């Protein structure tokens, strides 16, 4: 492409709906930011004659960018803070607000089922029909040309032109003309979307009835070409290309992704998420996915190994190492999302896959809840324990925020005659948007071996061991976060990751104990009694409390990092929860749990009066006012409380010298900590 004409890297599409109040066609855009890295925004230009908006694209200079970015985020027609409300103003004065549920025509039928007025698509539909409620429009194109400088490219985001629209029409007509032939040759999906927990949203939110509807005409054309030339060796890469080229591919504006905006994969969070706006890769830029290489770690030539795959309950041979990722809790509905790929593979697959059963076998899917699941897990791991060689091990992948499920897994491991001997945490989320707030950023790998000996311990002994184990784990993670605090990512780990680290530490200690407070745990695990279950749950909660007590916010100033342990519990509570608030709204129970872990009494006085169950926050310095400053009180007499009061005084216009004098008096002998 060097020296050639520019080609399309990405095409951006969005829904478009008619506002019932104004009669205008409105593009559905959560934000008008196109690219943070390139400082690009979209502008809605009213066209009163046609009662619709043209969309212009504008580059913003660095000096104006912070303000323009904030404005563009606020001017999206479906703002995230609007909770599903479409907002637009043709004249800049009158704002029309309509719930998307109203536009869709949501209602409940006589049986109480949620329904709407969206037309179910016919199999042959590849774009919305003119009468459909949800239309689709191209609103921006990113053009690119390679330069002679290695690794550099010239890129431009441009508004849509009549030439772009003509190309869209040509592609659509070409795909329509060849649809039947491609389907007959097995190059396109012909499979209907089966109802399910994950797949129901496709019909409910878009009216899609067949898997091909998840792809626009450009994507169907690219998919058919790739499918025609696919071999057994290239099949994984072709399927991954489809993962990056669907109507479900979110357009990320983040500077940390793609340098300034990129198409994210369908399964960035293992779900079928419909998008109000999405990105479509140009064919030339699917190449880097098609030519990617799998990471391999070959065994030494002297080693002889056989790799086997089968259900654990059917295992009959002895083995040395086993790797498993069992379902648990609200596990991913793999049996449903597999069908995204099965739809493309089932017709006329490469010769090597002829004997494969191209069916997701939903009826056989194991669900990770209930007594039946627990007993099935015990049987599976017991069978694996029986066939494990003397030095063998199982690597178990597990990730979940629920302490209850970690407790259940502990009982399963006990009942199977196994113990946790090692664990490590792998960060798997690279997207900064996913590495925030309550999102788990990785997965835990547990090493299981056969239980050895009969170790007896009392609860107070185990609490001491848990404290030491959790402390060592948290200090390692805090150290890594401190080293990375200067990076934009804000550190590797979020608070929920420390919580999971506490759970794994608890499992290492607990499963290594055979008799606890006189209770034989492996026998008890067959049907845990109330007393034993309560004791295990309490120890797991204790480990979580220890982790939360030790947790420090990422990015602390050096002086505060050194003096963190000098802060009292109320100060640490305020700083930790304030750090979490930077990631977005928090639930009220997060503050309650943190206060319990840090043993902070009366934390409610630090909470805003506006706090609700699903949207809570701390009081700001102005809201704290001048009260609650009793020098004998843990919070009222703390340097942090004094500092917040000083900030309030400065905001009110008090002289800096006078405020410093008040601050010094309030802090008395602890002023050095604040310098």
Give the location of each predicted region:
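Nucleic-acid modification enzymes, centered on SAM-dependent nucleic-acid methyltransferases
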Residues: 4-320, 331-366, 380, 404-405, ...
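A short glycine-rich, Lys/Arg-flanked "PGG" loop and its adjoining helix->strand segment in the class I
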Residues: 374-390, 415
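Conserved beta-strand signature within the Rossmann-like core of class I S-adenosyl-L-methionine
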Residues: 392-398
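Conserved SAM-binding loop
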Residues: 327
